[in-house]
Amino acid sequence: PQTIRGIPGDKIFFVQLADAPKIDMDLFYWSRHFRNMPGEGDLPVVEFMRAVAATGYDGPLSLEIFNDQFRGGSPVEIARDGHRSLIGLMDDVRRNEPDIRLPIPDIPPRAHCHGVEFIEFTTSEEEAADLAALLAVMGFTHAGNHVSKQVAHWRQNDINILINTEESGFAHSAYQAHGASVCDIALRVDDAARTVERARMLGAETVTTPTGDGELSIPAIRGVGGGMMRFI
């Protein structure tokens, strides 16, 4: 990187990027089959781009990714992943090299996660009894029910499990699509609103769910696999 910093920025006309996991194998095979987006591997891509940005370079960034999964994947999803990775990469660069010329969106900083607040299962009334029995065997106790919905709260120390047997809404739709499964995960963060805003600017789909009397409005995004990821 220090050598790159000595190059005049106007002498660099194009930058191609790729990341990859560190795997001990033939270099050519590794390069052709295991590349991934910046930030998804083990290579010092941030350090490399910090050096490039420090030269005053303000030209295009290109992704050159050879990967067996990408070849058979959805072009739209791959393009979104690539866009997200570039925005995230350059946000990291800007925070370490503030005097750069590359145009970068001003997004909130990375969130600090303090833990999992709860995990919510969607299931039917019949299957809920079996799940509750399993939780009881594992040492969980029934801590209460939702004020207006068919949701039971099970707890063991700081671990919170919710069993949702609603017959409408997102949880029920998830049950119809996947059967008994995790539909919702909530994480404790420093600032839920800014966490969701960062996710939105990185391409995540924000989700607003209807709330009734006495219910909290918890910021959320659509997670991997279509589930809900909430922030508290």
Please report, for each region that a protein language model flagged, where it lies by residue.
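Structural preference for beta-strand elements that scaffold enzyme active sites
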Residues: K11-Q16, D58-S62, F118, N160
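Amphipathic alpha-helical segments
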Residues: E125-T141, R198-L202
